[in-house]
Amino acid sequence: MLNYFFKKQLRLSDSTSFQDVFNGSVKKKNTLEISILGRFNLLGHPRLGLSIPRKNIKHAHNRNLIKRLVRETFRLLQYKLLSMDFVVIAKKNILFLNNTRIIDMLNSLWSNYYR
């Protein structure tokens, strides 16, 4: 039975990991609302980092909502994804979408990284 927890080992925790993804991203998928950068790792499981700039999304409750939605879609799809480090970057236009549209868009973006 698969366990769908979002453990600490599935997170990008330090700045060097983020910089490695920003500088050496192999796969980039963009929409007007979100970008996902990906870089292969040797860990055998995917890891997620979030970049939700305060400059783009002013209110903390909106930033937290976006983070929750991204983490939830990642958590549910973690066993389908390639062994990569991902950084998700939110853009201003994401505020104009409702939750179901954001989830659908994230699922379609994650599908580009399936095994």
From Swiss-Prot:
Keywords: Endonuclease, Hydrolase, Nuclease, RNA-binding, tRNA processing
Pfam family, one: Ribonuclease_P
Class in the EC hierarchy, top level: hydrolase
EC annotation from Swiss-Prot or TrEMBL: 3.1.26.5
One of the protein's GO biological processes: tRNA 5'-leader removal
UniProt keyword tRNA processing, yes or no: yes
Catalytic reaction annotation: Endonucleolytic cleavage of RNA, removing 5'-extranucleotides from tRNA precursor
UniProt GO cellular component terms: ribonuclease P complex
GO molecular function term, any single one: 3'-tRNA processing endoribonuclease activity
Origin superkingdom: Bacteria
InterPro entries: Ribosomal_Su5_D2-typ_SF, Ribsml_uS5_D2-typ_fold_subgr, RNase_P, RNase_P_CS
Binding partners and assembly: Consists of a catalytic RNA component (M1 or rnpB) and a protein subunit.
Function: RNaseP catalyzes the removal of the 5'-leader sequence from pre-tRNA to produce the mature 5'-terminus. It can also cleave other RNA substrates such as 4.5S RNA. The protein component plays an auxiliary but essential role in vivo by binding to the 5'-leader sequence and broadening the substrate specificity of the ribozyme.
Entry similarity comment: Belongs to the RnpA family.
Stored NCBIfam families: rnpA
Protein name per Swiss-Prot or TrEMBL: Ribonuclease P protein component
Annotated organism of origin: Buchnera aphidicola subsp. Acyrthosiphon pisum (strain APS) (Acyrthosiphon pisum symbiotic bacterium)
Gene: rnpA
